[in-house]
């Protein structure tokens, strides 16, 4: 494994209704990046916020000496689509993702850059002393275990978005066109050398989690359908097992009917209904799982954009930080973009 030269670091942060936390987020992220001794840019993607987040991001990008790039999406597309939009606008040799809620402190960024410079393709993180509620921690552990077994990549905290990706990995992810994706899993599919570091985890200081029960359920289906077809194979095995169990149960009822007469068969009617309802439930569950796969295939076949960027606001060349100017990156202000 050879050292990886890093001249420019991009920090991509998806933002959704984070007006209260943005000033502190910008201040702490810029301070952490200044410690790197490298050129940097902070790409903040507004994912259709309903508060003043987009206005604050644009103002931050337009101020003198700003390293902020504001990417404004026309509506809410979800966290991972917003991150991909940020990837598309980033230019760094190393791209770091970070949540806007400050539960993972930006002060950990230099540690990620240090490990990536050693030659790792992907640097993940493990939340130490996680501050989320139990109903969020336990499903996360189950998902992490399932992902490890399915992908064969032993990373322990796929839910933590504080991660670093080499430029080649980012370009490979952008070349993938499926709509339902989970970035940490997708990245590990292209990475040869990966590692993890333990990072601090704080309670959410502003607002509340954007992941409702329905969003978590949708994320679970994204995980299942984007990483493996194993559930479909299991469904076939379950169907075969149920058919065999049904045949054996019917044979068992026939033997009892012959042994105990017609009166016993009448008493066993409710048992038969219970078994029938159980089989029907499993069938409907299987149909729902098939529907999830077919629905995602339909979305991919339509080939619609995963996101639409309404506008991109960058610092003018005269306002770029000196470190960024030395790296040779310049751009015009408020440039329109296409997905």
Curated annotation (Swiss-Prot):
Pathway: Glycolipid biosynthesis; 4-amino-4-deoxy-alpha-L-arabinose undecaprenyl phosphate biosynthesis; 4-amino-4-deoxy-alpha-L-arabinose undecaprenyl phosphate from UDP-4-deoxy-4-formamido-beta-L-arabinose and undecaprenyl phosphate: step 1/2; Bacterial outer membrane biogenesis; lipopolysaccharide biosynthesis. GO terms for molecular function: phosphotransferase activity, for other substituted phosphate groups; undecaprenyl-phosphate 4-deoxy-4-formamido-L-arabinose transferase activity. InterPro entries: ArnC_tfrase, Glyco_trans_2-like, Glycosyltransferase_2, Nucleotide-diphossugar_trans. GO terms for cellular component: plasma membrane. It is found in: Cell inner membrane. Its main location: membrane. Gene3D superfamilies: Spore Coat Polysaccharide Biosynthesis Protein SpsA, Chain A (3.90.550.10). CDD domains: DPM1_like_bac. Its EC number is 2.4.2.53. It holds the Pfam family Glycos_transf_2. It catalyses: UDP-4-deoxy-4-formamido-beta-L-arabinose + di-trans,octa-cis-undecaprenyl phosphate = 4-deoxy-4-formamido-alpha-L-arabinopyranosyl di-trans,octa-cis-undecaprenyl phosphate + UDP. It is a multi-pass membrane protein. Keywords: Antibiotic resistance, Cell inner membrane, Cell membrane, Glycosyltransferase, Lipid A biosynthesis, Lipid biosynthesis, Lipid metabolism, Lipopolysaccharide biosynthesis, Membrane, Transferase, Transmembrane, Transmembrane helix. The chain crosses the membrane at residues 235-255, 269-289. HAMAP family: ArnC_transfer (MF_01164). NCBIfam families: PRK10714.1. Catalyzes the transfer of 4-deoxy-4-formamido-L-arabinose from UDP to undecaprenyl phosphate. The modified arabinose is attached to lipid A and is required for resistance to polymyxin and cationic antimicrobial peptides. Belongs to the glycosyltransferase 2 family. This is Undecaprenyl-phosphate 4-deoxy-4-formamido-L-arabinose transferase. It comes from Pseudomonas aeruginosa (strain ATCC 15692 / DSM 22644 / CIP 104116 / JCM 14847 / LMG 12228 / 1C / PRS 101 / PAO1). The gene is arnC.
């Amino acid at each position: 494994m050879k050292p990886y030269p890093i001249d420019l670091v991009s920090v991509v942060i998806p933002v959704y209704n984070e007006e209260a936390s943005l000033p502190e987020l910008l201040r702490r992220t810029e301070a952490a990046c200044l410690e790197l001794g490298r050129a940097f840019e902070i790409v903040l993607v507004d994912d259709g916020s309903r508060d003043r987040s987009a206005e604050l991001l644009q103002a931050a990008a337009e101020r003198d000496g700003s390293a902020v790039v504001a990417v404004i999406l026309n509506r809410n597309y979800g966290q991972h689509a917003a991150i991909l939009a940020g990837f598309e606008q980033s230019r760094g040799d190393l791209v770091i993702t970070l949540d806007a809620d400050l539960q993972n402190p930006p002060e950990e960024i230099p540690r990620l850059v240090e490990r990536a410079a050693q030659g790792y393709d992907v640097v993940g993180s493990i939340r130490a002393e996680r501050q989320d509620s139990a109903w969020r921690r336990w499903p996360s552990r189950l998902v992490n275990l399932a992902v490890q077994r399915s992908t064969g990549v032993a990373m322990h905290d796929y839910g933590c978005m504080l991660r670093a990706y080499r430029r080649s990995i980012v370009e490979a992810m952008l070349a993938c066109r499926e709509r339902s994706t989970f970035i940490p899993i997708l990245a590990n599919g292209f990475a040869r050398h990966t590692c993890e570091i333990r990072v601090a985890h704080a309670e959410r200081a502003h607002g509340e989690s954007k992941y409702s029960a329905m969003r978590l359920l949708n994320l679970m289906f994204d995980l299942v359908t984007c990483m493996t077809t194993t559930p479909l194979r299991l469904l076939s095995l379950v169907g075969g097992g149920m058919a065999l169990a049904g045949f054996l149960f019917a044979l068992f009822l026939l033997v009892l009917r012959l042994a105990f007469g017609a009166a016993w068969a009448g008493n066993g009617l409710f048992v038969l209904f219970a078994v029938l309802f159980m089989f029907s439930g499993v069938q409907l569950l299987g149909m729902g799982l098939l529907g999830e796969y077919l629905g995602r295939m339909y979305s991919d076949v339509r080939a619609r954009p995963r996101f639409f960027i309404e506008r991109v606001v960058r610092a003018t060349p005269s306002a770029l930080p000196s470190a960024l100017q030395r790296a040779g990156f310049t751009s015009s202000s408020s440039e329109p973009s296409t997905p």
